[in-house]
Structure formats: structure tokens, C-alpha cells
């Protein structure tokens, strides 16, 4: 089994964008989100990581656009951004997305989060967005508690997998935080998807080496948009690792 590659399409104001360290105002626009997602699909991606940044920041929604993107793709989609209650979770799943990420609500509404982990199982993943050892919420604009305390609670609730993002690395192309990923994998039996900082094929090989520890996938965004490598090259590298 090789690591799963999830090319990222982050959407703000109807456009595919990339941020640097999650900061609002640091966007670089890359055009139509559907075009980006279809390009990754054509290149062989079997998953797309689709994010509503406006919903994550609490400043709007691209829900209709994202639902349309999901409908037009033939591959699996992990949908993220602004899922904080039953209504938004049901709406996200109704798009046809294979999996929905819950971030802020896992920190701000633990009882609800614990319930949906048990109820929805594999269809829900928990986004752990980390700065140092502190979690961040609300589009990475607020502190959300201690990583290890929250991880322990979520494990007890039966979280099926974690998407772990080092915010200081995201969008910087400075390499992933391998130490953080090792630590998280050592403290949970749930699979981990790595996000943030991937910039080279060597980074993908380094992440593939963590597969025995529990890393099952990697989200790549900026590196693909910037042309550091293609989806096809990334898939080949992960298959050969």
C-alpha cells in the first residue's frame, strides 16, 4: 500500500487560492476550483481535498460551488471548512463527499464532536491544526487548547482518523513537520493524514517512510500549483517508496 495523495483545492470568494501559514490576506488566486480539481483528477489523483476557506474563517460560504465541484468529479472528495453542527455536517455529506473534516467544532463543541465521531465513523475525520503544541480554531485565528489533551479525548470518542496540519509550514513549501507527525502517530492508533509544507518529491518519500508509524496520506497544495512536481510524479514517487 502506498500513501494516498490528496491534492488540495482551497476556495475563497469562488476562486481556488493558496494561503501562507493560513493567514487571511495572503491568498494567491489560481482560478476556477473545478478546473483545478478536474486537472488533478485527469493526472490520476483518486482523492481531492476540497476546502471552503470562507466558511472556515466564518466570513461566508462557497457551499453551492463546492457541491457542484463534488458532483462533477469521479473521484473521492474530502470536504473541509465550516462544519460545526448537525445541519452543516448533513449538508456537507449530502454533496456526495466521501469524507468530511471537522476542525473548529472538535475544539469548541466537544460533546457534539464526540457524538458524530461515534455516529458517522469513517465518514468524518478530525482536523488537528497545530502551532507548536497548541491547536488553532476558526480558520486558525484562535487558540483551541493543548494538542495532546484534545487527541486523548478524541481517541476516547472513537475518532476514525486525523488530518494533522502544521500551520507554520502550510503554504510555505519548507518541508513537512516529520517530528510532529511521529509524535501524533505514537499517541494514537487512528490513521493520520499529513498536511503542510510539502515541497519536493523527497518530502513525499520522507512521509512515506512514516507509513508504518500510522501516516496513511498526504495533502499537497502549493507545490502542485507552483509546479514543483506533478500529481503523476507524486503518485509514482509514493508508489515506489
Curated annotation (Swiss-Prot):
It catalyses: 1-(5-phospho-beta-D-ribosyl)-5-[(5-phospho-beta-D-ribosylamino)methylideneamino]imidazole-4-carboxamide = 5-[(5-phospho-1-deoxy-D-ribulos-1-ylimino)methylamino]-1-(5-phospho-beta-D-ribosyl)imidazole-4-carboxamide. The active site is at residues 10, 129. It is found in: Cytoplasm. Pathway: Amino-acid biosynthesis; L-histidine biosynthesis; L-histidine from 5-phospho-alpha-D-ribose 1-diphosphate: step 4/9. InterPro entries: Aldolase_TIM, His_biosynth, HisA/PriA_Actinobacteria, Isoase_HisA-like, Isoase_HisA-like_bact, RibuloseP-bd_barrel. Gene3D superfamilies: Aldolase class I (3.20.20.70). It comes from the Bacteria. Keywords: Amino-acid biosynthesis, Cytoplasm, Histidine biosynthesis, Isomerase. Its main location: cytoplasm. One of its GO terms (cellular component) is cytoplasm. It is an enzyme of class 5 (isomerase). GO terms for molecular function: 1-(5-phosphoribosyl)-5-[(5-phosphoribosylamino)methylideneamino]imidazole-4-carboxamide isomerase activity; phosphoribosylanthranilate isomerase activity. Pfam families: His_biosynth. One of its GO terms (biological process) is L-tryptophan biosynthetic process. Its EC number is 5.3.1.16. Belongs to the HisA/HisF family. This is 1-(5-phosphoribosyl)-5-[(5-phosphoribosylamino)methylideneamino] imidazole-4-carboxamide isomerase. It comes from Salinispora arenicola (strain CNS-205). The gene is hisA.
Amino acid at each position: 500500500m502506498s500513501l494516498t495523495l490528496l491534492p488540495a483545492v482551497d476556495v475563497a470568494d469562488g476562486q481556488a487560492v493558496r494561503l501562507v501559514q493560513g493567514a487571511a490576506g495572503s491568498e494567491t488566486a489560481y482560478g476556477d476550483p473545478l478546473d483545478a480539481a478536474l486537472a488533478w483528477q485527469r493526472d490520476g489523483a483518486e482523492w481531492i481535498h476540497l476546502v471552503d476557506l470562507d466558511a472556515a474563517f466564518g466570513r461566508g460560504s462557497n457551499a453551492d460551488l463546492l457541491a457542484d465541484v463534488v458532483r462533477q468529479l469521479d473521484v473521492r472528495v474530502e470536504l473541509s471548512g465550516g462544519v460545526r453542527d448537525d445541519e452543516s455536517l448533513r449538508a456537507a455529506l449530502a454533496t456526495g463527499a466521501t469524507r468530511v473534516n471537522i476542525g473548529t467544532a472538535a475544539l469548541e463543541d466537544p460533546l457534539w464532536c464526540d457524538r458524530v465521531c461515534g455516529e458517522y465513523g469513517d465518514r468524518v475525520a478530525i482536523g488537528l491544526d497545530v502551532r507548536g503544541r497548541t491547536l488553532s480554531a476558526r480558520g486558525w485565528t484562535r487558540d483551541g487548547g493543548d494538542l495532546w489533551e484534545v487527541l486523548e479525548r478524541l481517541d476516547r470518542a472513537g475518532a476514525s482518523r486525523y488530518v494533522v496540519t502544521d500551520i507554520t509550514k502550510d503554504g510555505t513549501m519548507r518541508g513537512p513537520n516529520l517530528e510532529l507527525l511521529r509524535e501524533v502517530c505514537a499517541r494514537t492508533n487512528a490513521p493520520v493524514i499529513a498536511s503542510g509544507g510539502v515541497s519536493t518529491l523527497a518530502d513525499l518519500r520522507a512521509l512515506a517512510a512514516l507509513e508504518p508509524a500510522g501516516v496513511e496520506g498526504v495533502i499537497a497544495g502549493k507545490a502542485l500549483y507552483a509546479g514543483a512536481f506533478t500529481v503523476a510524479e507524486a503518485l509514482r514517487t509514493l508508489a515506489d517508496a
